[in-house]
């Protein structure tokens, strides 16, 4: 008989009366009145093994096994006795009567029980091998595998070709810092790990491969958050001779296919499309969570002449904004709740949080409860009540500051209230999946510190055709042929139509204050390629880690990556990064300089 004939979790009634050989790990060992029960686990699940004392040698071995011992058992599949069926297990109607038990490898006492749900992330990542044995982690990584498989199936059916691009490449400015790799044979020179395959996939379009994809690692040396890793995985795609709408349709279908085939979720037949300007005006975010049934109300124009300088000053500022967030039934929020929200918005730069409770709307000013009402004239109060559509029992929160602070703080408050217990109880958040496309992004953002424009996405995104003239006269007015796919408040994919003409690409570089010499030095290979009849092309990249995190309902991207880094970009399992030998540094012509100590 083979070492293993079946997976533990797949032993069911169809094997009744058969002898099987199973391999796995001891989940738990129980001694019940002279009979030993072993819950044997492998990647497919659990099966109950019964060790009877009639087989003395086998029973003696069973007495010695402990949690996480790796064992092989041979035995007879039989029905469980009446009253002992476990409906929670696929194998819960049967058990295996053990005839032979072999310890393949003993285990030291594990540092934690695999069914402990209260482990710190540090403990889990330090002992990642054991953590990966947990059923939830097994589920997450197998889900990740299925998502990748279904993406490949779809793209293959659509005529895409999987082509690998280099991991050692040229350092080019794309927003985040590069991970640099020193070259031993080219002293003093460095490769960079790719932040994306962006330029190579464009070159593949010029090279007539028409449709390209790869599921690939990308690297960015940036500050980490719950949804970021220094190395992450993209489903990276590019296609020729398709317009923006056709590209969106193609990849919208891909995401629908993946969700249906992996978790049996039917996404909307057509994803709504929202311009960037509308998303910012209504939600303060370019990745709005449409499950939350709360929206901003614009009040900037109505607050220009009020005596309340907290409102009037930003209302009259060039980059200022005053906006409101009406919360239905929010009048029941306590002062403690409001104080908590006030402290919360300070995280996002807000100086405070003004509010008005609407007790009796019909009474106008007299029906409102708020410390700020006395500072507002009747016309402004009327505008607030009319524009927000406030009703008795509502509360209205206000943000007034630079537009970015208003958008960030009030947008975060919108999500916090919507997803709170109060929000759930009052229907302020819907269940399910709410996808959309956000389009028409600004082409450039102005960097006050450097006094120049920077690319909002990357410098290879095409401006909208009608905005080409602004590249040289007013770059701030340019909108891009860029699009992000957003799902439940997460950007899961982003892409654009690319620049395919050399003269347009050069104009964009000039708008970014990248001179001809610098452009040739950094991007000469691209500019040269664009001169050889480059086709119109565009593409998109999806964050595989993010998609799987959402599907799995995981708290963090780290829960869907086998060996992730911490928020300090450290691998607690292998203790990377770590110092290297002085000889290695000499071979690379590198001398370390100690970081400067902060002054006392």
From Swiss-Prot:
Its localization reads: Cytoplasm
Any coiled-coil regions, as ranges: none
Put simply, this protein is called: Aspartate--tRNA(Asp/Asn) ligase
GO cellular component terms attached to this protein's record: cytoplasm
Catalytic reaction equation(s): tRNA(Asx) + L-aspartate + ATP = L-aspartyl-tRNA(Asx) + AMP + diphosphate
Q: Which residues of this protein are annotated with the site description Important for tRNA non-discrimination? A: 32, 83
What's a single GO MF annotation on this record? aspartate-tRNA(Asn) ligase activity
UniProt binding sites for ATP: 220-222, 229, 491, 543-546
Q: Name one GO biological process term.
A: aspartyl-tRNA aminoacylation
Q: What is its EC number?
A: 6.1.1.23
The family line of this record is: Belongs to the class-II aminoacyl-tRNA synthetase family. Type 1 subfamily.
Write the record's keywords in alphabetical order, separated by commas.
Answer: Aminoacyl-tRNA synthetase, ATP-binding, Cytoplasm, Ligase, Nucleotide-binding, Protein biosynthesis
Q: Does the keyword Amino-acid biosynthesis apply?
A: no
Question: Is Cytoplasm a UniProt keyword of this protein?
Answer: yes
Known role: Aspartyl-tRNA synthetase with relaxed tRNA specificity since it is able to aspartylate not only its cognate tRNA(Asp) but also tRNA(Asn). Reaction proceeds in two steps: L-aspartate is first activated by ATP to form Asp-AMP and then transferred to the acceptor end of tRNA(Asp/Asn).
Q: What class of enzyme is it?
A: ligase
Assembly notes? Homodimer.
Q: Which residues bind L-aspartate?
A: 174, 220, 457, 498
Location of the region described as Aspartate in the Swiss-Prot/TrEMBL record: 198-201
